Curated annotation (Swiss-Prot):
Homodimer. Its EC number is 4.1.1.23. It comes from Fusobacterium nucleatum subsp. nucleatum (strain ATCC 25586 / DSM 15643 / BCRC 10681 / CIP 101130 / JCM 8532 / KCTC 2640 / LMG 13131 / VPI 4355). Pfam families: OMPdecase. Belongs to the OMP decarboxylase family. Type 1 subfamily. It catalyses: orotidine 5'-phosphate + H(+) = UMP + CO2. NCBIfam families: PRK00230.1, pyrF. InterPro entries: Aldolase_TIM, OMPdecase, OMPdecase_AS, OMPdecase_bac, OMPdeCOase_dom, RibuloseP-bd_barrel. The gene is pyrF. This is Orotidine 5'-phosphate decarboxylase. Keywords: Decarboxylase, Lyase, Pyrimidine biosynthesis. The keyword Transcription does not apply. It is an enzyme of class 4 (lyase).
């Protein structure tokens, strides 16, 4: 499986989003459209990004009763995006329904389950979610549920990736957000790592936002991170 960097387009407006994408000229990217961008601007965001030939990870983190998620995914299938996220906490019937909706629509969109957010610490999880286990065990449990329910993969931090890979096999997609370079600030993420860490532990994709979008030269920073992720421990500055 080819390793790819997904750029998080965490912009509030379509105008700022397209202004950023136009800096990459002919380069075809894999980009993440999150709730802020999609809900504030609507489906036109998807249309404009697709017009430019970029792949889309629509990160809506759907979580509702199975029939509602099935119907929502059926509606989103018409965009023929590359990846869509749902919450593993929605349970097996919800996960199965989301995957079934894409299959029935005849599209190849990958359905990926969110495990624990990288902004969640173990203390947060125990106090606020009342899950009295380690965060690693919680993530591995959600990953097992996702695989058994037939979805294509999970989103997790790098910290759990190696064990998910061992548990779920080589074809299972693992997406790591919370990726930073050593000199970057953590922002609101708590469980973070570098592109080289993600490569070493077996991630399929990494999601990088501010490290690229907030850089004075985003094209150069993107290529640096791409090289680091593709080469892993073989990367030499």
């Amino acid at each position: 499986m080819k390793k790819e960097v997904i750029i998080a387009l965490d912009f509030p407006t379509l105008e700022k989003t397209l202004e950023f994408l136009d800096k990459f000229k002919e380069e075809k990217l894999f980009v993440k459209v999150g709730m802020e961008l999609y809900l504030q601007n609507g489906p036109i965001v998807i249309d404009e990004i697709k017009k430019r030939g970029h792949k889309i990870f629509l990160d809506l983190k759907l979580h509702d009763i199975p029939n509602t998620v099935y119907s929502a995914v059926k509606g989103l299938a018409k965009f023929n995006i590359d990846i869509l996220t749902v919450h593993a906490a929605g349970g097996s019937e919800m996960l199965k329904g989301a995957k079934r909706a894409m299959t029935e629509a005849g599209v190849n969109t990958k359905v990926i389950a969110i495990t624990q957010l990288t902004s969640t610490s173990e203390e947060d999880m125990r106090k606020e979610q009342n899950i009295q286990t380690s965060i690693e065990e919680s993530v591995l449990n959600y990953a097992r549920l996702a695989k058994e329910s037939g979805v294509d993969g999970v989103v997790s931090s790098v910290l759990e990736t190696k064990k998910i890979r061992e548990q779920s096999g080589e074809e299972f997609i693992i997406i790591n957000p919370g990726i930073r370079l050593a000199e970057d600030s953590k922002g609101d993420q708590k469980r973070v790592a570098t592109p080289i860490d993600a490569n070493r532990d077996g991630a399929s994709y990494i999601v990088v936002g501010r490290s690229i979008t907030g850089n004075e030269n985003p094209e150069e920073r993107y290529r640096l991170i791409k090289n680091m992720f593709e080469m892993g421990d073989k990367y030499v500055e």
